[in-house]
From Swiss-Prot:
The keyword NADP applies. NCBIfam families: RutA (TIGR03612). Keywords: Flavoprotein, FMN, Monooxygenase, NADP, Oxidoreductase. This is Pyrimidine monooxygenase RutA. Belongs to the NtaA/SnaA/DszA monooxygenase family. RutA subfamily. Induction: Up-regulated by the nitrogen regulatory protein C (NtrC also called GlnG) and repressed by RutR. It is an enzyme of class 1 (oxidoreductase). One of its GO terms (molecular function) is uracil oxygenase activity. Its EC number is 1.14.99.46. Disulfide bonds: none annotated. It holds the Pfam family Bac_luciferase. Gene3D superfamilies: Luciferase-like domain (3.20.20.30).
Length: 363
């Protein structure tokens, strides 16, 4: 099973709590995180894109770096780990994304890929005057389908004459082309999102579910497998989890309860409000899960809370789910969390037993 790190491009990572570590996103922090992840044989690093935060006492995600420029910098200071940036497709023409991706392919020596997102938080785009109207909620995957076709044309042949409802290319050129086939990833949980991934993505991200219920996402992975079978493609699921680990189950649980007790209710209210804006995409979208009150303090990603042995066992359970090809991990404290994962958790995981021995620790 592949392991990736979801780097904290926004302030405070993924804990919406006054009791969680409070920090700003910087290149130096993310450089240290990704170099440490590479040292511990993580397979990939992904950054999101967020253009407006949730506010509240913690100013959650009010402070964000930009994904492509951050990952270009990280590509230059790593050598093995795969690097993925996220394109907010309403903000960037596909021909520009194609050229930026080809540039980072050159920087990284063929280790780069692109995560495509349609955009769900209306204020991110209204503030710039580029929100296309609420009809977009129901047409966003039509838009993304045209977008990715332009990308594939330009990466594959260096030229596009695509004509569609959203994009018109007239002998559009991009050169040099990527040195290896460019991977495209998506994070669709709705039927429309999974249908898109089944046709165009190399793999699909989905949320884990619940606390210490590592296989609860299995129905989502099964839906993705079924969608991919209909297109004749192999599109695996990569599952998002937060790891909160300590020497004992009780110690880890105490940390989790402490974070929940400090939940930033004002920021969470903003998330809930935004999740209700899309009345056209159904009830199975990512943002609906993010705003579920069950575990909103970490946007309802699956949460693994326990001793190092308990977390290792639960991750092996994740690997046993049909269609689950990888996990994307976040941590309450990224630097210490990755080190603890590499030293204390990963060596206990049967699904990672193939890894070579560690070299000297990264500085």
């Amino acid at each position: 099973m592949k392991i990736g790190v979801f780097v904290p491009i926004g302030n405070n990572g993924w804990l919406i709590s006054t009791h969680a570590p409070q920090y700003m996103p910087t290149f130096e922090l993310n450089k240290a995180i990704v170099q440490k992840a590479e040292h511990y044989h993580f397979d990939f690093a992904l950054s999101m894109i967020k253009l407006r935060g949730f506010g509240g006492k913690t100013e959650f995600w009010d402070h964000n770096l930009e994904s492509f420029t951050l990952m270009a910098g990280l590509a230059a200071v790593t050598s093995r780990i795969q690097i993925y940036a996220t394109a907010a497709t309403l903000t960037l023409p596909p021909a520009i994304v194609a050229r930026m991706a080809a540039t980072i392919d050159s920087i990284s020596g063929g280790r780069f890929g692109v995560n495509l997102v349609t955009g769900w938080q209306k204020p991110e785009y209204e503030q710039m005057g580029i929100w296309p109207g609420d009809d977009y909620f129901s047409r966003r995957y039509d838009y993304l389908t045209e977008y990715v076709q332009v990308l594939r044309d330009l990466w594959g042949t260096g030229k596009s004459d695509f004509k569609g409802d959203f994009f018109t290319m007239n002998d559009c050129r991009v050169s040099p082309q990527p040195s290896v086939p460019m991977k495209v990833i998506c994070a669709g949980q709705s039927d429309a999102g999974m249908a898109f991934s089944a046709r165009y993505a190399d793999f699909n991200f989905c949320f884990g579910k619940g606390v210490n219920t590592p296989t609860a996402f299995a129905p989502t992975a099964a839906r993705m497998k079924q969608a991919a079978e209909q297109t004749g493609r192999d599109v695996g699921s990569y599952v998002l989890f937060m790891v909160i680990a300590d020497e004992t189950d009780d110690a880890a649980r105490a940390k989790w309860e402490h974070y929940k007790a400090g939940a930033d209710e004002e920021a969470l209210s903003w998330l809930t409000e935004q999740s209700q804006k899309d009345t056209r995409s159904g009830t199975d979208t990512n943002v609906r899960q993010m705003a579920d009150p069950t575990s909103a303090v970490n946007i309802n990603m699956g949460t693994l809370v326990g001793s190092y042995a308990s977390v290792a066992r639960m991750l092996d359970e994740v690997a046993s789910v049909p269609g689950a090809e990888g996990v994307l991990l976040t941590f309450d404290d990224f630097l210490s969390g990755i080190e603890t994962f590499g030293e204390r958790i990963q060596p206990l995981m049967q699904c990672r037993a193939h890894l070579p021995a560690l070299t000297q620790e990264v500085a």
